[in-house]
Amino acid sequence: MKVLHAAAEVYPLVKTGGLADVLGALPEALIGAGADVRLVLPGLPAILAGVEQQQVVHEIGAVFGAGRVTLRLGRLAHNGVPAYVIDAPYLYQRPGNPYLAPDGGEWPDNLQRFGLLGWVAAHLAAGELDPGWTPDVLHAHDWHAAMACAYAACHPATRAATVYTIHNLAYQGLFDEDDFHLLGLPSRLMVPVGLEFHGQLSFMKAGLKYAHRITTVSPTYAHEIATEAFGCGLDGVIRARGADVSGILNGVDGAVWNPASDPLIAAPYSADMLDGKALCKAALQRELGLAVDAGAPVFAVVSRLTSQKGLDLLLDALPALLNFPAAGGPQLAVQGNGDPALEAAFTAAAAAHPGRVAVRLVYDEALAHRIMAGADAMLVPSRFEPCGLTQLYALRYGTVPVVRHVGGLADTVVGASEASVQADRATGFMFGPATPAALAQALLQAVAAHGQPALWHRLMLRGMAQNFSWTAAASQYMALYRETQQAMQATGKL
């Protein structure tokens, strides 16, 4: 089976969130399951530099306002997965964030930049740009690639099944409806039952309306987005798709996230030999300027600093941690950036509590590994969370997660209760309402458990024993691909 993945990011070349981690690991797992997999990616500077053995496949010419568009085929340098790169310097040769200009606003031509990504993916699926390789399945990821589903649906030569994965429904790719003509799609699509969304053009709806099957990155999130509370205004569209929507949990790339072999941490360790984790903790405390105190539980945040991630709740719950005496009292390490108000508030907390609170307003992959290994507990208090990878990494590193019961967090963490602890099922701590009081209660529960070494040790080991592999996810995707193909063959359309 030939599968083409269309996406805007791939780890380690371009990463703004978990989408990149998925594209960095899932294709390899699918190849391991027997699929013939290729990616199609925008020719951002880091992607052009990170794809080796490039050969020109097709000179596309001037489309989407770009003076020159060339389709190249090479292999990702880090894992050898084949990847098409859309070389369009006018649209993609820009520094920094793939979506945002240096002033923090969206690039004004993002419609053309990601419309081109979808257009190329669909024309590859139609066998037009590389006649030597035509996919059986076109798998588009998030709004950046969603328009591929609309282009494929309108192309008479398309025989590929289309699958669309929602990594985060909140980011929808909304544009001025007057710019619809720039996409070159039939005008009949720009209606409320098509791509129109409250007077705007929605890339997200291209995937929701025109993909044969829709997936999200956890079973619970698949149910949540069909409700008004989590549907971001699209719950009706999602409910209308019914059984076409399913959830498949993300996995963990064991080659990247493994404390036994991680070259980025102070000392290796495993469930059988945990001594290295204490060394990682002391090293992290020294690096961040926290008091070096083996008995002090270190709570950590590795996240975008946004209200979606519930970090305003953490600020309001912080006194619950800091009211303990400094000696042996809880510490907090925060890494990430985002909302300027949250950045300022966490910076102020660090200034007010030296040795107890440390903040690094940057995303640094190596530092994220050191925090994951050195912290005792990882905080993920999200208001909504499609899957969440942070808690999966934390479990693997014996860093006990404290999470809200929502989305993929609910699917991957077993909250500590009397029953779950006695049954040796507990892997973390969980709270329900999105309130500072509920989070504070979970934090205090974690502090109390940390004071019971035998209990904490059991939580760590149970978490490290969890198996969230990409092999399992790949098996589910392969089954979905086959089922979608069979449905197409049986009906001619879905």
From Swiss-Prot:
Official protein name in the record: Glycogen synthase
Organism domain of life: Bacteria
Reactions catalysed: [(1->4)-alpha-D-glucosyl](n) + ADP-alpha-D-glucose = [(1->4)-alpha-D-glucosyl](n+1) + ADP + H(+)
GO molecular function, one term: alpha-1,4-glucan glucosyltransferase (ADP-glucose donor) activity
Pfam families assigned to the protein according to its UniProt record, in alphabetical order: Glyco_trans_1_4, Glyco_transf_5
Binding site for ADP-alpha-D-glucose: K15
One of the protein's GO biological processes: glycogen biosynthetic process
Keywords: Glycogen biosynthesis, Glycosyltransferase, Transferase
This protein's encoding gene: glgA
Organism, as annotated: Polaromonas naphthalenivorans (strain CJ2)
